[in-house]
Amino acid sequence: MPYLGSEDVVKELKKALCNPHIQADRLRYRNVIQRVIRHMTQGLDMSDVFMEMVKASATVDIVQKKLVYLYMGTYAPLKPDLALLAINTLCKDCSDPNPMVRGLALRSMCSLRMPGVQEYIQQPVVNGLRDKASYVRRVAVLGCAKMHNLHGDSEVDGALVNELYSLLRDQDPIVVVNCLRSLEEILKQEGGVVINKPIAHHLLNRMSKLDQWGQAEVLNFLLRYQPRSEEELFDILNLLDSYLKSSSTGVVMGATKLFLILAKKFPHVQTDVLVRVKGPLLAACSSESRELCFAALCHVRQVLHSLPGHFSSHYKKFFCSYSEPHYIKLQKVEVLCELVNDENVQQVLEELRGYCTDVAADFAQAAIFAIGSIAKTYTDQCVQILTELLGLRQEHITTVVVQTFRDLVWLCPQCTEAVCQALPGCEENIQDSEGKQALIWLLGVHGEKIPNAPYVLEDFVDNVKSETFPAVKMELLTALMRLVLSRPAECQDMLGRLLHYCIEEEKDMAVRDRGLFYYRLLLVGIDKVKQILCSPKSDPSLGLLEDQPERPVNSWASDFNTLAPVYGRAHWATISKCQQVERHRLELPHNASFATSGHLISEENKEGAQEPDSDTLMLVPNLQLTAEYFEKTWLSLRVSYQQVFPWQGEVQPDTLQMALKVVNIQTIAMSRAGAQPWKAYLSAQDDTGGLFLAELLLKPENSEMQISVKQSKARTESLHGFVSVLETVIGTVGDIKS
């Protein structure tokens, strides 16, 4: 919808542009053109003055030309017939003696989005590639990519590609970088520009003459080159050494990634590089740019996966500031958890304790969870702080503290006494589902150590009709069933009332079925109840699974200096694929073959110039596979791997299933504990879509565990990675001796 009065404005400007007195005065004429541009940017339709603006391009004033060319690029699609007149003017300016005019005209011509413009811009672009002025060559090189996009699904012009490859030897560094960008765009269907030995060495020698943007770009392209020998590799690393000290964060990160990729067979070199870039990473974490700060923090967490405690001496750099946004604070809290050691634990805990009373409830709860994470190592100090937080009687604080206590007593049974002493009275400040479930679980499992446990549960039973969360009711049923075994006199009556309500009045079928199950279980006998419900109250071995082992640098080196640490590898892979599909959805694959520049790229160097494939396995979380689909797929595949391991004792299904879930392996079906023979069927999927199906079989004598694995895609590296993960989990849970 046009603005009110826009027609009058257009008429006034059109009249002014045609006024010979204004045309004779350069400043007045330019001011009128500026008014046209200003109204155009404000949303007014200024296409009616197109002809007058084309006439205004016939001037020696470069500023005026630039304004007119901006206008032409905007309205050429709306006025294609009149735009042909503009093309004639632009073609004439492409031969102007002034290189600034030639470059400006060529850039504007390549920016015209109108049908049939390709035939007009091809020759000026080719001429521009051979222009004496570097500015014109810069524009012409980028114009090649624009021209290719205008051609759509046509074949790649081999002569043009050869011309661009030869321009990689240009004396102007910006021309070189623009050539790489254009070749990457033109050859994207063929895998992008090929970096062989001559090109790689040429780019390395020209690095010092590039600006910081160009250096970062070239470092990214050099990732595609694989040195042929160790001597060549270390020569390249020596050339890149100075860029680890660059003032530009982008250059430092690009150089670091190149070091990590090239030195994949030399872990000590990778470690040395990560030590040297500690300073730039810390500086980025303190940057005023919030986006840069957040990305740097994600990279710090990535480095800590391979070098725990790498930033421990600089832990204060990760203390939160009041003015920082929420997402940066959360990242810093996560980093602080990984930097705790004997020397700084007191200072870190005091800092986290201050965050627990922050006005932002989410941040306060994250700080409490962080203290709970540290409590696995420094139990006494953390339990004391958490107990003091209960005294604040704040609902959101109490809820998270109780959840932390629940996880803590499961992994650290030595703190059970202190937790049980702190619980009485906290039930008054818990209203949400997660907090209620945690409290009820603690009262049911450790109720014999909590004097008022039956009376707290009785309050929940009395108010069960008004309880809105089915999960709370189910937890309440289980807790009372457990507590009645240790304190029958106090719990028997309320258990009867709860079972009656769940069976006769409850509308949620899951709760009703749980009540019927427990009722029938009681009819069988108290011994059977003890056998089923008296499971272990803690399992410290699960802490080994939560504390992931150090990951080799090579497992994440390819993700460094990308958004993968920010989004997560699996999510970032999905985003990248969606972007590629959206970008190329209207394009057809190119089947063209073209000649390449003889002295820069040769056939024998193509194989060595390809980027090496990553052998890192990443399992996709939350895979949902039905039993029917599993069975159908299992029967259609052959066994890819089978191995037998020594085993001692029975399998604890709950512990094993939880451990497998931590590493993103789904349990399809599993035998109950003590079954003869014992079996389990598992599934997982990697980030490339490859499916892994596994069978665990424990022989009747409980002496051997057989693992059989099938995969949908025959990839040896992925299979070995999956088997390694599976064996690690089973070995941790069952203490396999292989």
UniProtKB/Swiss-Prot annotation:
GO terms, molecular function: clathrin binding
Compartments where found: Golgi apparatus, trans-Golgi network membrane
Main location: Golgi
Record note on disruption phenotype: Mice lacking Ap4b1 are fertile, have no overt anatomical abnormalities and have normal life spans. They only show a significantly poorer rotorod performance than wild-type mice. No significant differences in body weight or grip power is observed compared to wild-type mice. The cerebella has normal foliation and a normal laminated cortical structure. Main neuronal types are present in the cerebella and the gross morphology of the soma and dendrites of Purkinje cells is normal.
Region (Hinge): 534-600
InterPro entries named in the record: AP_beta, AP_complex_bsu_1_2_4, ARM-like, ARM-type_fold, B-adaptin_app_sub_C, Clathrin/coatomer_adapt-like_N, TBP_dom_sf
Region ranges (Ear): 601-738
Keywords, ordered alphabetically: Golgi apparatus, Membrane, Protein transport, Transport
GO biological process: intracellular protein transport; protein localization to somatodendritic compartment; protein targeting; vesicle-mediated transport
GO cellular component, one term: trans-Golgi network
Source species, domain of life: Eukaryota
Pfam families registered for this protein in UniProt: Adaptin_N, B2-adapt-app_C
Membrane topology qualifier: Peripheral membrane protein
Function in brief: Component of the adaptor protein complex 4 (AP-4). Adaptor protein complexes are vesicle coat components involved both in vesicle formation and cargo selection. They control the vesicular transport of proteins in different trafficking pathways. AP-4 forms a non clathrin-associated coat on vesicles departing the trans-Golgi network (TGN) and may be involved in the targeting of proteins from the trans-Golgi network (TGN) to the endosomal-lysosomal system.
Subunit structure: Adaptor protein complex 4 (AP-4) is a heterotetramer composed of two large adaptins (epsilon-type subunit AP4E1 and beta-type subunit AP4B1), a medium adaptin (mu-type subunit AP4M1) and a small adaptin (sigma-type AP4S1). Interacts with TEPSIN; this interaction requires the presence of a functional AP-4 complex. Interacts with GRIA2; probably indirect it mediates the somatodendritic localization of GRIA2 in neurons.
PANTHER family (alphabetical): ADAPTOR COMPLEX SUBUNIT BETA FAMILY MEMBER
Protein family per UniProt: Belongs to the adaptor complexes large subunit family.
Name under which the protein is recorded: AP-4 complex subunit beta-1
Organism, scientific name: Mus musculus
The encoding gene: Ap4b1
